[in-house]
Regions:
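Hydrophobic alpha-helical segments
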Residues: 1-179
Length: 179
């Protein structure tokens, strides 16, 4: 964890809880290692704070995340950046039923063929959708996990990782802006 320990150690005192939470989610054993590090990579790319992305990518490499899994996690962040905006917009529109009846007409082949186990990819989509606040996408990907027998604590762990990565990223970005 050295790259992430360095990141945690660099957080200001007001973010001590966040630094401790980072250590906790790194040590988490509920997810497989690829699932966990894919959640970190997808979440980092969703927030896109360069220093955090670099630290998480280095930690994922050190933990042995396979290159194809890393690319799929980045792909989850990319496709959810598109889908979360589209489906969240429809969900908050007053006349959303009219729009729900229309085909999205957006390519999203990576969702059906991510190149990694579906459970892993859906977890990464849950993490990114939590960051981006898309309830419909959270429901869709969490529902897919449940339909395959994945326990709720697994999705919860992905959301915890996403929450911590988001918080670390906001602190790092805020401190850089204030400097």
């Amino acid at each position: 964890m050295p790259p992430l320990q360095n990141l945690a150690d660099s957080l200001p005192p007001y973010a001590n809880d966040i630094a401790l939470n980072l250590g906790s989610v790194v040590a988490e054993t509920i997810l497989t290692e690829p699932q966990k590090w894919g959640c970190f990579v997808a979440s980092a790319h969703a927030v896109a704070v360069p220093r955090v992305v670099k630290a998480i990518e280095a930690a994922a490499d050190a933990a042995g995340l396979a290159p194809d899994a890393k690319l799929a996690a980045r792909g989850a962040a990319a496709i959810m950046a598109q889908n979360n905006v589209y489906f969240r917009a429809i969900a908050i529109m007053k006349n959303h039923q009219d729009y729900r009846a229309l085909r999205a007409r957006l390519r999203m082949r990576i969702v059906s063929n991510p190149g990694v186990p579906k459970d892993d990819f859906d977890l990464w989509c849950v993490a990114v959708s939590a960051i981006n606040g898309c309830g419909d996408c959270l429901d869709a990907h969490e529902g897919a996990l449940r339909s395959r027998g994945v326990e709720p604590v697994v999705a919860q762990t992905a959301m915890r990782i996403a929450a911590v990565v988001q918080a670390v990223s906001r602190v790092v970005a805020g401190e850089a802006a204030a400097a």
